[in-house]
Amino acid sequence: MGICFSAGDVSSGLLIFSAMQQEDDLKALENIVQFARGLGVFFLVLHVYWYCYEWLSSCGLTYGYADRLLLDIQRTTLLFSSPVVTKLCAFLFLALGCYGTKSVRNGRVARRHIIAAACLGFPLFFLNGFLLSLPAGIGFRGWSYTLTLGAGYLCLLAAGVWLRRLMKQPLMDDPFNDNNESFLQEERCISNDCSVNLPTRYRYKGQWRNGWISVVNVYRSTAVIGLPGSGKSYAVLNNYIKQHIEKGFSMLVYDYKFDDLTRIAYNHLLRHLDKYAVKPKFCIINFDDPHRSNRCNPIDARFMDDISDAYESAYVTLLNLNKTWVDKQGDFFTDSAVILLAAIIWYLKIYDNGCYCTFPHAIEFLCQPLERIFPILSSYPELENYLSPFMDAWKSNAQDQLQGQVASVKIPLSRMISPQLYWVLTGNDFTLDINNPEEPKILCMGNNPDRQSIYGAALGLYNSRLIRLINKKGKLKSSLIIDELPTIYIRGLDNLIATARSNKVSVCLGFQDFSQLERDYGEKEAKVIINTVGNIFSGQVVGDTARTLSERFGKIVQLRESHSVSNENVTTSTNTQLETLIPVSKISNLTQGMFVGSVADNFDERIEQKIFHAEIVIDNDKVKAETAAYVPIPEISSFIGEDGKDHMEEIVKENYYRVKADVAELVLREIARIEADPKLSQLLPKKKQG
């Protein structure tokens, strides 16, 4: 009868054989260690016998055979030619014995104990030779030398054993897993006629390396995210401004803290005017200081083609004045306010060839009595259907409803009634088509954190009108740099990001985190902006923003080591695991100037490693020298009269009252026209018909 063995039996047998083989190997190693340690003690005994021979002889501890043997060894090997030779031999075998010791690992052994034992043992063991030449008795010299030699040997033995017992924990060398999470990054500088190139330093496997962030396709838009102080403007936005001016871009800069970015743009333009085929005009919108501001009419009749343009202008302005309206689209009072303001803007556009079509005129017209506003507006067929909800309430004498509808637009707009705002909004120093090949512009719009809710409405209107004008074919390449994006609402920004690439419009948006953008732009629009941006830079951010970015950067295969410590040895197992490339904790703890992110590439400019985690290198000395050489922004508008005095306040106020007078005169003319027409006169209140 045959004997059958199962696969399990064979496997168990192999494991038992392997364990037995391992045990035999350990026993053999232990024997070698004991032998090495014994040799060390043997050399130590030989050393004492040779160099303390006189003392041992007086004690009757010498032997003729041993004497002859040692003399023969000395003649052939010169082992005793110097005391250091035998000491080194003893020390060598001591070290081998300690290295191979199968000792109990103890994490509580401190390095200071090892250092103390070694510092005590080395002098006692190697530097005690002077004791043999002391002017003392032979017994004292022998005993003192032997005791110090033995004590030194024991101290060195203790240091060696403790060093072996000192449990080395490889994971503690990299407690934050920095080396394992480091990765090779792009080290080539890939440049083209629109790229932004930033030098970097990054760590890979514990070593600093030089790299480059090459944004070769700026037309796929860029988001620069980071908490205050993370270095967004200094490291990224400033470089976008400088490098795009150097490459001949027309530009819009939204300068939230005027004039930080404006000063950079102006001075850099002065140095690089030769990069433009047509010299660009440098324009500024600054409501705080009319001296340093151009004037521009954002609702210029020449650039409004139909009533939808008026609706967009009204919508943007009111949403900037009431950020909560972003989530109230479709609400009765919200839509009523937008429609009424849009109707007024379009009315001013079609009246007298649009000579009164400015936003201050629209505000002043809205402040007229209702019994004048509605008859005038409804007397135009283009607005009759547009205003039907208001006219129904007007004809049915629903005054409470009508007053509520009008108040919903009048109250927020009343905050914009300001002589300085009126001054800037009623002029025509330039047009908003900044990428016009015949008249390119560098336009800087300045806000003021103390008045951002008021200025933001006008600036949001400028920006919204501008992006509709520049996102067209056949224009110059242009760059939009928007710092602190949530402080203004720009309608159509999501559409611009999605379509601007074909029209050579670069968009660079700076903001603090995604939640801030969702609060001021609404969840849906914010998600579209976030998900359609092709290039992203992020400094330190926390919470959901850090988690979203970490997921966006994906995962990488990492090497994992597991250490199991026992009384016998340390067992190490190694495996690979798919882990997050840049974890949330890293993004949440980035230092100033360190950025993570990714870039988009082109068909003919491939970037294999698009993701980066690096410090953007800024030559601080060079930047300081450039800043020190900057010239101040000159006055754009002069209010100096013939008497040599500055009459800015008087001129600005005169313009303010002129707008009011224009509207009052316009209303009188329109009422007279309506009264003279039998059909239209029915639109007037009954008291007017008598």
Language-model segment annotations:
Residues 7, 58-61, 168-172, 176, ...:
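P-loop NTPase motor domains
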Residues 7-10, 19:
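Acidic, Ala/Val/Gly-enriched low-complexity intrinsically disordered segments
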Residues 14-230, 234, 239, 247, ...:
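Basic- and hydrophobic-enriched, low-structure N-terminal and domain-boundary segments
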Residues 497-499, 503-600:
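Conserved ATP-driven motor cores of ASCE-family P-loop NTPases powering translocation/secretion/packaging/pilus
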